[in-house]
Curated annotation (Swiss-Prot):
Glycans are attached at residues 10-11, 24. The lineage of its organism: Eukaryota, Metazoa, Chordata, Craniata, Vertebrata. Residues 246-261 have a biased composition (Polar residues). Keywords: Behavior, Cell membrane, Cell projection, Disulfide bond, G-protein coupled receptor, Glycoprotein, Membrane, Receptor, Transducer, Transmembrane, Transmembrane helix. It comes from Pan troglodytes (Chimpanzee). Residues 60-73, 133-152, 217-346, 404-422 are cytoplasmic. This is 5-hydroxytryptamine receptor 1A. Residues 1-38, 99-107, 175-193, 371-378 are extracellular.
Length: 422
């Protein structure tokens, strides 16, 4: 979806591109050969990388069974959509940029604009579908396991294409202004004010708000779980410092005949806590050291282990035991905090990339139609904004697939042609 025409800057009317309002901007139709060569190389490289990256994601999901799940079906559908952008839209957009004017005729222009808006909108809405799937998975993990079916994924994917279709078709049915087709060298989407609001909010602003809410709640839910784990670890460490590790706490009452076949009893130490059974000591309410002694049930009778004084001295090292548990607790605490930092980083990359690529474009797309006589966009800035939005189709497979270890393993198999041998 182009915001501005490829070239704007002198004193002739510039050919506006999709989602451009024209305004009081001007441009040149003739460009230098060096500009065409450099632009062709840059845009050709971008298109090639976008095609290759998204094709690899699709191939990985199709060939690797471990990747064939609902979450990855959504990522695969996103890759297919971005592949369509790369193959059907970007070559014509690059030609428009290189030649600095539209040369393919009005019918092709209408088709180009429809495909542009349809595919780019569907790509953005796929990001919403992935966010929604992740939100359900993390906030309702038990029930959503049964609801997370291929049919639900297909419904979400169909909805993204339906909304994209509803946004891309109206200009072809007449929702445009008479000036939209006045310049044969320009290929522009409808500059109608009503359609501008309808298309920009439907394709970006509402999805952006939805993604911010969903990923905000995902972060809060993930942070709550992580901090709950940290508190549990800290509580376990506190219990250990008082001499009661989870493995040594009774699971049933002492007289629980219907309970487990093993019990643990505390008896007052005769050695003031210097000796212990099974390597654990804990304090009683009155400060006396209690030795933990195993009691095993055999049939209907109880066999008592001999007291330490009877079985001989069994030295223990409660201090060492405590230090070890403290180290374990600290390690788990650090792991939990690392997970929280990774969550923040991942969500930051997802939202940061999406906003960086598309927000400048849609700000211009929304503002320009309402300030035709007073707005001016520099040539270079207009081109950067246009292609920054398109580059999101290149970055999506990197963010959603290449950072995933399962996908990395599948890509290695593809490179080494292991699937070919199979």
């Amino acid at each position: 979806m182009d915001v501005l025409s490829p070239g704007q800057g002198n004193n002739t009317t510039s050919p506006p591109a999709p989602f451009e309002t024209g305004g009081n901007t001007s441009g040149i139709s003739d460009v230098t050969f060096s500009y065409q060569v450099i632009t062709s190389l840059l845009l050709g490289t971008l298109i090639f990388c976008a095609v290759l990256g998204n094709a690899c994601v699709v191939a990985a999901i199709a060939l690797e069974r471990s990747l064939q799940n609902v979450a990855n079906y959504l990522i695969g559908s996103l890759a297919v959509t971005d592949l369509m952008v790369s193959v059907l839209v970007l070559p014509m957009a690059a030609l428009y940029q290189v030649l600095n004017k539209w040369t393919l005729g009005q019918v092709t222009c209408d088709l180009f604009i429809a495909l542009d808006v349809l595919c780019c909108t569907s790509s953005i809405l796929h990001l919403c579908a992935i966010a929604l799937d992740r939100y359900w998975a993390i906030t309702d993990p038990i029930d959503y396991v049964n609801k997370r079916t291929p049919r639900r994924a297909a419904a979400l994917i169909s909805l993204t294409w339906l909304i994209g279709f509803l946004i891309s078709i109206p200009p072809m049915l007449g929702w445009r202004t008479p000036e939209d087709r006045s310049d044969p060298d320009a290929c522009t989407i409808s500059k109608d004010h009503g359609y501008t609001i309808y298309s920009t909010f439907g394709a970006f602003y509402i999805p952006l708000l939805l993604m911010l809410v969903l990923y905000g709640r995902i972060f809060r839910a993930a942070r709550f779980r992580i901090r709950k784990t940290v508190k549990k670890v800290e509580k376990t460490g506190a219990d250990t410092r008082h001499g009661a590790s989870p493995a040594q706490q009774p699971k049933k009452s002492v007289n629980g005949e219907s309970g487990s076949r093993n019990w643990r009893l505390g008896v007052e130490s005769k050695a003031g806590g210097a000796l212990c059974a099974n390597g654990a000591v804990r304090q009683g309410d009155d400060g006396a050291a209690l030795e933990v002694i195993e009691v095993h049930r055999v049939g209907n009778s109880k066999e008592h282990l001999p007291l330490p004084s009877e079985a001989g001295p069994t030295p223990c090292a409660p201090a060492s035991f405590e230090r070890k548990n403290e180290r374990n607790a600290e390690a788990k605490r650090k792991m939990a905090l690392a997970r929280e930092r990774k969550t923040v980083k991942t969500l930051g990359i997802i939202m940061g990339t999406f906003i960086l690529c598309w927000l400048p474009f849609f700000i211009v797309a929304l503002v320009l139609p309402f300030c035709e006589s007073s707005c001016h966009m520099p040539t270079l800035l207009g081109a950067i904004i246009n292609w920054l939005g398109y580059s999101n189709s290149l970055l999506n497979p990197v963010i959603y697939a290449y950072f995933n270890k399962d996908f990395q393993n599948a890509f290695k198999k593809i490179i080494k042609c292991k699937f070919c041998r199979q």
